[in-house]
Curated annotation (Swiss-Prot):
Membership in a protein family: Belongs to the UPP synthase family.
A Pfam family that the UniProt record links to this protein: Prenyltransf
Cofactor note: Binds 2 magnesium ions per subunit.
Catalytic activity: 8 isopentenyl diphosphate + (2E,6E)-farnesyl diphosphate = di-trans,octa-cis-undecaprenyl diphosphate + 8 diphosphate
Classification of source organism: Bacteria, Pseudomonadati, Pseudomonadota, Gammaproteobacteria, Legionellales
Signal peptide span: none
Swiss-Prot/TrEMBL cofactor(s): Mg(2+)
Protein name: Ditrans,polycis-undecaprenyl-diphosphate synthase ((2E,6E)-farnesyl-diphosphate specific)
Keywords, ordered alphabetically: Cell shape, Cell wall biogenesis/degradation, Magnesium, Metal-binding, Peptidoglycan synthesis, Transferase
Length: 238
């Protein structure tokens, strides 16, 4: 493709359960199938030299799902991390994890920290896995940290601006997404990156995540290439 490409893509991988149910399978089978799509999209990003891919793996609201499904998701996440980390590292992928880790198991937390440490110097792609995250949580937590910094005398009140505030978010140091993709026909962002998506181009598709392949990814990129990103300004034609 010769058209412009996004440098940071954020994805809500929706529809695993619906994909499975439509085939008469348990919902957990959809989550397993969804891992194949993750691998495909990671490879696409590497081929197209996209800098950052954020995957919304588990939201803070997902704890309300059946306990058996939540437990399966956590085990699947841990198993996938253990199995794929060496391959990700060999391909120059840097792993980052965004979200509140405290409620996660100690075993999973350690695996996440070890993966970050192992891949910290890799530069081919930042793979940001978003786990136990909510946009409102991120903003409130950032506000608390900011207030504490001001009270400690490390920052003056009149020094606070958008750039300063962003440094207190859990995504600090990462570029804001250029393209947001959500699968499975849901037309909302569901408390994901509320601050970070301010000027992001949104792309929605009816395709369930396990069916989101290289072709579907290409369609999203083509759609992005046709957008005129104005960042609140008017276009030259206007």
């Amino acid at each position: 493709m010769n058209h412009k490409l996004p440098q940071h893509i954020a994805v809500v991988m929706d529809g695993n359960g619906r994909w499975a149910e439509s085939r008469g399978l348990p919902r957990v089978e959809g989550h397993k199938a969804g891992l194949d799509s993750v691998k495909k999209i990671i490879n696409c990003c590497l081929e197209k030299k996209i800098s950052c891919l954020s995957l919304f793996a588990f939201s803070s609201e997902n704890w309300s799902r059946p306990v058996t499904e939540v437990n399966f998701l956590m085990e699947l996440f841990l198993e996938a991390l253990r199995k794929e980390i060496d391959d990700l590292n060999q391909h120059g992928i840097r792993l980052k994890f965004t979200g509140d880790r405290e409620p996660l198991s100690q075993v999973l937390q350690k695996q996440m920290s070890d993966a970050e440490a192992l891949t910290k110097n890799n530069q081919q792609l930042i793979l940001n896995v978003v786990v136990n995250y909510g946009g409102k949580w991120d903003i409130v937590t950032a506000a608390r940290k900011l207030i504490r910094t001001v009270l400690d005398g490390k920052l003056a009140y009149d020094e606070i601006n958008e750039a300063v505030f962003a440094q207190f978010l859990d995504t600090k140091g990462m570029p804001e997404p250029d393209l947001f993709i959500r699968t499975s026909g849901e037309l909302r962002i569901s408390n994901f990156f509320l601050w970070q998506l301010a000027y992001t181009e949104l792309y929605f598709t009816d395709v369930h995540w396990p069916d989101f392949n290289e072709h579907e990814f290409e369609l999203a990129l083509i759609s992005f290439s046709k957008r005129a990103r104005r960042f609140g300004q008017i276009s030259q034609s206007e």
